[in-house]
From Swiss-Prot:
It is an enzyme of class 2 (transferase). Its EC number is 2.7.4.9. GO terms for molecular function: ATP binding; dTMP kinase activity. InterPro entries: P-loop_NTPase, Thymidylate_kin-like_dom, Thymidylate_kinase. GO terms for biological process: dTDP biosynthetic process; dTTP biosynthetic process; dUDP biosynthetic process. Keywords: ATP-binding, Kinase, Nucleotide biosynthesis, Nucleotide-binding, Transferase. One of its GO terms (cellular component) is cytosol. The gene is tmk. Phosphorylation of dTMP to form dTDP in both de novo and salvage pathways of dTTP synthesis. Belongs to the thymidylate kinase family. It catalyses: dTMP + ATP = dTDP + ADP. SUPFAM superfamilies: P-loop containing nucleoside triphosphate hydrolases. This is Thymidylate kinase. It comes from Xanthomonas axonopodis pv. citri (strain 306).
Length: 227
């Protein structure tokens, strides 16, 4: 059985400071939902397009200003929305994003750009139905980065990550759920899956929850919860 969510699909954004486990959760959540019969599109920001590639190079070298990084992020996101996110949602897919516009607000905001202006510049971007904020103390995140053999980049200092964490916590966006990312990866996945199933129940209640197809879809997703 293939689960479709029409109209509009379901947009899930996974956010948090560096080292919080966003990429791990995004991949495992996508695999879990796919196995349950959902149509899942997994993506990330910055993307692998020209603007995103330039941004990752900047993260390694620190050569761009916060304003220049913000401009590249907006260009990258416009292309991402137009070519991948919006079409997938129109098909009724579940879209999972490893970082999205809240990261721009947190990181460029921590660099001194006004938060309200950053949010306004992202008004074109579809708002997530579910925003999973993986909350983690910066020292733990930095320890994880070093443990995987990576050298912290110029964003990944304790002071900067503290500022980013504060901004993430203060962001008031619909669908925001704070997940304790200091727990093990299996526990984080279970927390996230429960949140997604609850969001899907709300989503289906608006259209198909009272049909046999809608009920079967929700039962299938609920049964696929991680052990």
């Amino acid at each position: 059985m293939t689960i479709e969510l029409k109209p509009g699909g379901l947009l899930i954004a996974i956010e948090g400071i560096d080292g919080a486990g966003k990429t791990t959760l995004a991949r495992r959540l996508a695999a879990t939902l796919d196995a349950a019969g959902a149509r899942v599109v997994l993506s990330k920001e910055p993307t692998n397009g020209p603007w995103g590639t330039q941004l990752r190079q900047s993260a390694a070298t620190g050569r761009l200003s916060a304003e220049e990084e913000a401009e590249l992020l907006i260009r990258d996101r416009h292309e991402h929305v137009d070519t991948l996110i919006a079409p997938a949602l129109a098909r009724g897919d579940i879209v999972i994003l490893d970082r999205y516009f809240p990261s721009m607000v947190a990181y460029q905001g921590a660099a001194g750009l006004p938060l309200d202006e950053l949010l306004e510049r992202n008004a074109f971007a579809p708002r997530p139905d579910v925003l999973l904020l993986l909350d983690l103390p910066p020292p733990t995140g930095l320890a994880r980065i070093r443990a995987r053999g990576d050298a912290p980049n110029h964003f990944e200092t304790q002071d900067n990550l503290e500022r980013c964490r504060t901004i993430f916590a203060a962001l008031e966006l619909p669908g925001k759920h704070v997940v304790d990312a200091s727990a093990d990866a299996d526990s984080v996945l279970r927390q996230a899956h429960a949140i997604i199933v609850a969001a899907l129940a709300d989503r289906l209640s608006g259209d198909a929850a009272h049909t046999d197809t809608g009920k079967a879809a929700l039962e299938l997703l609920s049964a696929g919860r991680p052990a």
